[in-house]
Regions:
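Sec-dependent signal peptide recognition
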Residues: 2-8
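N-terminal signal peptide c-region/cleavage motif recognized by signal peptidases
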Residues: 14-15
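Amide-donor transfer/coupling interface in amidating biosynthetic enzymes
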Residues: 20-74, 101-118, 145-254
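Glycine-rich beta-strand-to-loop/alpha-helix junction loops that act as flexible
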Residues: 28, 79-81
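Glycine/Thr-rich phosphate-binding loops of Rossmann-like dinucleotide-binding domains
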Residues: 34, 85-87
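Catalytic nucleophile loop
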Residues: 76-78, 107, 113-139, 226
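A short, gly/pro- and small-residue-rich
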Residues: 88-106
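Short, solvent-exposed loop/turn and secondary-structure capping segments
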Residues: 88-89, 135-136, 144-145
């Protein structure tokens, strides 16, 4: 089954290579219980509407398979999902540590490091922001509600993800500032966040309690919220994906 999935992924890449639009790789979640890979369709839809060709990247234990795909795509999206296991940043799991997928952690860390080494543009979303920071040498706050962030605000909204839930302040001059301006309203569905920054990364947006909501590095934009779930009602959020597609077009020319 995994071989079939990878064959389909490579077929999609081959078809996309004949087009002029850039190929945007999207990492997927993995369910061990039924041995399936999946991702919310909102990521696929956002890439299509931003002008790219989405290519799903299922988890593979063979790092050579990851390298083969990363030789083909023009950009990489790290999608949302489970908590990143603290073993990857030298800590033990706290009592508040949530659902995990160590296989996915390991695979995505490989993808991120490959992408960075090849200067492939990266957009990391929610968990994606967290695993990117870990992959590049940073650490995470394992649970915001039990941490020292103050004043406390809710980071796990009960309303639909299409609805903004809290504000963020964006650092002037950052890539996200050029896309959204100095303030934005975002959705939120996480209980972990970036703690110690990876070398070369910079926090470029924060929530009112100081929780990091975006970080950037060379060729990398990470957001803690889900713009792909908001853009139908809030079109400015699609600009984050359009920005990635434009960066992918430039990479494709090289």
């Amino acid at each position: 089954m995994k071989r079939t999935i990878w064959s389909i992924a490579l077929l999609m890449i081959s078809i996309g290579a004949m087009a002029q639009k850039p190929l945007i790789g999207i990492s997927t979640g993995y369910s061990a219980s039924d041995n399936t890979a999946s991702v919310r369709f909102t990521y696929v839809d956002a890439v299509v509407n931003a002008g790219g060709i989405p290519v799903l990247i299922p988890l593979a234990k063979d790092s050579l398979a990851a390298a083969e795909v990363m030789n083909k795509v023009d950009a990489l999206i790290l999608s949302g999902g489970e908590d990143v296991h603290p073993f990857f940043y030298g800590e033990e799991p706290s009592p508040h540590f949530g659902k995990e997928c160590v296989e996915r952690d390991y695979f995505e860390i490989i993808l991120i490091r490959l992408a960075k080494s090849k200067h492939i543009p990266i957009l990391s979303v929610c968990r994606g922001m967290q695993v990117t920071n870990v992959a590049l040498g940073g650490s995470l706050c394992q649970d915001i509600p039990s941490s020292d962030y103050s004043p406390k605000i809710q980071h796990g909204q009960y309303s639909t993800n299409t609805t903004p839930h809290h504000s963020i302040s964006i650092v002037p001059g950052s890539r996200l500032y050029l896309i959204l301006g100095g303030k934005a309203l975002v959705n939120t569905h996480h209980h972990q966040c970036v703690k110690d920054l990876a070398p070369g990364m910079h926090i470029t947006a924060t929530a009112p309690d100081g929780v990091p909501e975006a970080m950037e590095g060379e060729g990398i934009l990470c957001v803690q919220f889900h713009p792909e779930s908001m853009y139908e009602k809030h079109p400015e959020m699609l600009e984050i994906y359009k920005d990635l597609v434009e960066r992918a077009k430039e990479f494709k020319k090289k």
